[in-house]
From Swiss-Prot:
Keywords: ATP-binding, Cytoplasm, Nucleotide-binding, RNA-binding, Thiamine biosynthesis, Transferase, tRNA-binding. This is Probable tRNA sulfurtransferase. One of its GO terms (biological process) is tRNA 4-thiouridine biosynthesis. Catalyzes the ATP-dependent transfer of a sulfur to tRNA to produce 4-thiouridine in position 8 of tRNAs, which functions as a near-UV photosensor. Also catalyzes the transfer of sulfur to the sulfur carrier protein ThiS, forming ThiS-thiocarboxylate. This is a step in the synthesis of thiazole, in the thiamine biosynthesis pathway. The sulfur is donated as persulfide by IscS. NCBIfam families: tRNA uracil 4-sulfurtransferase ThiI. PANTHER family: TRNA SULFURTRANSFERASE. Residues 61-166 form the THUMP domain. GO terms for cellular component: cytosol. Pathway: Cofactor biosynthesis; thiamine diphosphate biosynthesis. It holds the Pfam family ThiI_fer. It is found in: Cytoplasm. It comes from Bacillus cereus (strain B4264). One of its GO terms (molecular function) is tRNA binding.
Length: 404
């Protein structure tokens, strides 16, 4: 029986781009090549409106599993390539149909004749191909409105593609076309989702995590490393900056009125993150804030916190409720890591009654009583930076190194 030899990738949103589309296509091709590193026989051809992945014997299911997490891919189809002869097309359509998994009762045929000199018209091809499937299967009927399977035939000069297994991609834009941002990665449910949604818009991310030993444990730190590792499924790598925050928090607890300690803490985080962003050539800061979720996420709080940075602050979750955020976290694989019961620095010295409508004037007045600059400098200087990659890529590189 014929087997799938190709995967045809459709771009989706990238097709709206104009003169710079080639940059988007090139970046997507590079990201796909990186994602499929463990499949040495694969060949990739990226055209202006579609990508063709030639499997050359590689497992199409394993390849498909990795493709679904690549941003910039709208949909993709497993495909067979056959000569553009009627009998070959009929046999290819039947073979593709028989390989569809699940409870299939109905189908339809869709034909696109890119090669206009093919001797049969579309309306002549439909009954020929559909009839061949009906003759060689049982308990199957045609449903042109809501079929279980759509057998798609693309006829070209010399060869045709047969497709019926259509799968959804991650959508969005290829990571890397939209610059870089710094993501505040707390270890909770929200911030990894914010990182994911930022990457979906084609933006590379680096993560900043604030930890406060001995008030926060090594297990809490490892949780954040694991979250960053999980996010590498959707990009080439995630650079994680672990910032020691103990002295800053102790000083805030001592010098700032408790009602404003949360606000000032967030302002210090923004200042430190901006410094790291300048070092790393990032263009914005992303947070996992959702409007009204906690005291530090009211409009008044965000207005006061934003004052200390000139960088754009991206808040992808701003209008989502918690259940919507949890749903995405479960889908992308970060939820089970986020709910591990380890504390983070935001729970250290939590005030009993934080201000929900903090004023910039008050925050500035409280901060002016103590020079936080040396503490900020120290936190930036003592940060620990690590680069995380997909586990499989790391394993392949280690395997390569062992040869020498």
């Amino acid at each position: 029986m014929l087997k799938y030899e190709y995967i045809l990738v459709r771009y989706g949103e990238m097709t709206t781009k104009g003169k710079n589309r080639s940059k988007f296509v090139s970046t997507l091709k590079d990201n796909v090549k990186f994602k499929l590193k463990k499949f040495p026989n694969i060949k990739i051809d990226a055209t202006h409106d579609r990508m063709y992945i030639q499997l050359n014997g590689e497992d199409h299911e394993a390849v498909s599993e990795r493709l679904k997490d690549v941003f910039g891919i709208h949909k993709f189809n497993l495909a067979m390539k056959v000569p553009s002869e009627l009998e070959d097309i009929k046999e290819g359509a039947l073979a593709a149909f028989l390989q569809v998994k699940g409870d299939v009762k109905t189908f339809k045929i869709t034909v696109h004749r890119s090669y206009k000199h093919f001797p049969m018209r579309t309306m002549e091809l439909l009954p020929e191909i559909g009839g061949h499937i009906l003759e060689n299967t049982e308990d199957i009927t045609v449903d042109v409105h809501n079929p279980d399977v759509n057998v798609r035939v693309e006829i070209r000069s010399g060869y045709s593609y047969i497709m019926c297994d259509e799968r959804m991609g991650a959508g969005g834009l290829p990571v890397g076309v939209g610059g870089k941002v710094m993501v505040l990665l707390s270890g909770g449910i929200d911030s990894p989702v914010a990182a994911y949604l930022t990457m979906k818009r084609g933006v590379s991310v680096e993560a900043v995590h604030f930890h406060s030993p001995p008030f926060t444990s090594e297990r809490a730190k490892q949780k954040v490393i694991d979250l960053a590792q999980e996010l590498t499924k959707y990009c080439k790598r995630v650079t994680l900056h672990l910032v020691p925050f103990t002295e800053v928090q102790k000083t805030i607890n001592k010098e700032i009125p408790s009602s404003y300690s949360m606000t000032v803490m967030r302002r210090m985080m923004m200042r430190i993150t901006e410094r790291i962003a300048e070092e790393r050539n990032a263009l914005a800061i992303t947070t996992g804030e959702s409007l009204g979720q906690v005291a530090s996420q009211t409009l008044d709080s965000m207005h006061t916190i934003n004052e200390v940075t000139n960088y754009p602050v991206i808040r992808p979750l701003i209008t989502m409720d918690k259940l919507e955020i949890i749903k995405i976290a479960e889908e992308i694989g970060t939820y089970d890591i986020s709910i591990r019961p380890y504390e983070d620095c935001c729970t250290v010295f939590t005030p009993a009654s934080p201000a929900t409508k903090p004023k910039r004037e008050k925050a500035n007045r409280f901060e002016a009583k103590y020079d936080f600059t040396p503490l900020i400098d120290e936190a930036v200087a003592n940060k620990e930076t690590m680069v995380l990659q997909t586990v499989e890529v790391v394993a392949e590189e280690e395997k390569f190194e062992e040869l020498f």
